[in-house]
Design a protein with these regions (language model features):
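Extreme N-terminal leader/targeting segments of oxidoreductases
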Residues: 1-10, 28-29, 520-527
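N-terminal Rossmann-like FAD-binding beta1-loop-alpha1 element of flavoenzymes
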Residues: 8-35
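Glycine-rich FAD pyrophosphate-binding loop
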Residues: 27-52
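Mobile amphipathic helical/loop "lid" adjacent to a hydrophobic cofactor/ligand pocket
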Residues: 72-73, 77-78, 82-193, 201-206
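Helical element adjacent to the flavin cofactor pocket in flavoenzyme catalytic cores
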Residues: 196-244, 252-261, 274
């Protein structure tokens, strides 16, 4: 765009990863971007806030990434927070009773790099390992048509047809796929499961896990700073209620957006050259115009369902484990993240090294829909955020851990007390040191609409970034990104929306997507 032309204006509804990725890419390309976010902070479902009652800054749920997430890593590099991710090459599996096993890569070429560790897994029999190895080969090396495409069959059905033992399902496939896709195996499509397996096997680096070392909202506030530094604007506590644009026109008028300022409860109307709807599917359906052009979109959106994830935050009076994270087998809780070891304090060391000092969250705002507001209004908040204070602030050398339960439908209607009791019972099974530890305080966060359910047949209903309105585009991890509902999928959707928008604006050569992680070793023969 020439310097003599005014910058085209873009409204982006949604300040989650999809909206922020699109905004950063467009701000770098000469567009004047305004991001509208209904909450008082950025990050969407990947956010944090000061918990009312514990006084601690907590993430709404633990988020991790892997080296295969090339667009998410590029996004972090773009906004200057790549150094706030801690990377791990090894993964520890723990059985009830406390026996642990480490999976690590060997010098063998992909996909054999983890074979030595896998063959030494004591919690799988040789029969289990043979069955799993054959299934991995079918999913990654010579996938049949029902694996390459969504054949309307669940992964659990596929496992039964491919002679997977019950132990292989419970102790291998469930820990990997339920955590990755936030859904039960009988509701996961084969193609979604196969993609997770293929991506993890393509190189030794693919399975390296990254964990944010600062609160999530602090991480994504950097994206807000990045956008503002390039002439953009972030408007928090402002929600898009509806929009108006002429469909299928070569030269349509600007897009009119109808907004509500949640601070002063005022409604307003503004016009922009373009609009990106970076909203969850269940929110998008409410803002679509009541016109015939919306009908096809609405029909597709009816096929989506939400999957919940529950995070259980526990503060103990002593260190219960020397591990930073671990996969937990055979119980309700699937992962443990040792936050007092993971989080970086202002001096740059982990909390454990700082004698229990609380991690600061300089720009972490309170959620307007948090338990605190609901308490003031007298509402029951048992489905959102629940608190149990047992004592005062965390003691020096204490442990703060977060436990994660993906696909946690069976926990949604349980009380905080029941969930904390369950978590304590299981933690003490896995970590003997926890049996003598005193629980200081706890919090339970239920993210009811954490992801979409990757059910068989759903791929056909994931929408592209373009819409019937030539100046309106879609972003979100639920759109047709080629990836499941992950942070990587969200960023990809934002970049795809930005590419579609720049093409509509006449910039045909704009590309924002990063290349996929290259296959190495023998996997190069099958990529």
């Amino acid at each position: 765009m020439s310097g003599n032309q005014p910058q085209p204006s873009v409204a982006i509804a949604g300040g989650g990863l999809a909206g922020l990725a699109a905004a950063c890419a467009l701000a770098d390309s000469g567009f004047r971007v305004t991001v509208f976010e209904r909450r008082p902070y950025l990050g969407g479902r990947a956010s944090s806030y000061e918990h009312p009652g514990t006084g601690e800054v907590v993430d709404n749920c633990q988020h991790v990434l892997f080296r295969v997430c090339t667009n998410l890593i590029e996004f972090y590099r773009r906004i200057g927070v790549e150094d706030q991710i801690r990377w791990y090459e090894d993964m520890t599996f723990i059985e009830p009773g406390g026996r642990s096993t480490v999976m690590r890569a060997s010098a063998l070429p992909a996909p054999l790099h983890t074979a030595p560790s896998f063959l030494r897994f004591p919690f799988l029999s040789m029969k289990d390992k043979v069955a799993i190895s054959r299934a991995i080969g079918a999913l990654t090396l010579f996938p049949p048509s029902d694996v390459r495409h969504d054949a309307g069959k669940s992964f659990l059905q596929w496992c039964c047809e491919h002679h997977q033992t019950q132990t292989a399902i419970d102790r291998f496939w469930k820990p990997i796929l339920v955590s990755a896709l936030s859904e039960d195996l009988d509701r996961i499509s084969i193609s979604s499961a196969a993609q997770v397996v293929r991506e993890s096997m393509k190189s030794p680096a693919a399975r390296h896990m990254g964990v944010p070392a600062i609160p999530l909202t602090e991480l994504y506030n950097r994206a807000g700073d990045y956008i503002r530094a390039r002439g953009g604007e972030i408007r928090l506590r402002t929600s898009l209620e509806s929009f108006c644009s002429k469909p299928f026109c070569a030269q349509p008028s600007q897009v009119k957006v109808h907004l509500t300022d949640k601070e002063d409860k005022t409604a307003k109307e503004e016009s922009f050259d373009y609009l990106i709807l970076a909203l969850p599917f269940n929110t998008l359906v409410r803002v679509l115009p009541q016109t015939s052009e919306s009908e096809s979109l609405r029909q597709h959106l009816t096929h989506f369902e939400s999957c919940p994830i529950t995070g259980i935050h526990l503060w103990f009076d002593r260190e219960i484990s020397g591990l930073d994270h671990a996969v937990l087998l055979d119980r309700t809780v699937q992962w443990m993240f040792h936050k007092s070891r993971l989080l970086i304090t202002r001096s740059g060391r982990g909390q454990q090294e700082e004698s229990g000092e609380r991690t600061a969250g300089a720009n972490v705002a309170r959620d307007e829909n948090s338990a605190e507001r609901k308490l003031r209004e007298g509402h029951d908040f048992s489905r959102a955020v629940e608190v149990n204070l047992k004592n005062g602030a965390s003691a020096p050398h204490a442990s703060y851990i977060e436990l994660v339960v993906s696909a946690s439908k069976n926990l949604i209607d349980k009380s905080r007390a029941d969930i904390v009791d369950l978590a304590l019972k299981e933690v003490r099974e896995f970590f003997p040191a926890a049996r003598e530890a005193v629980l200081l305080k706890s919090a339970v966060i239920k993210e009811v609409h954490a992801t979409y359910s990757p059910r068989p047949g759903l791929e056909a209903h994931r929408l592209p970034q373009t819409t019937p309105w030539t100046r309106v585009f879609l972003a979100g991890d639920w759109t047709a990104t080629g990836w499941p509902a992950t942070m990587e999928g969200a960023v990809r959707s934002g970049y795809l929306a930005a590419e579609a928008l720049t093409r509509a604006a006449g910039k045909k050569d704009s590309h924002f997507l990063s290349p996929d992680l290259s296959a190495t070793g023998l996997m190069r023969l099958f990529s």
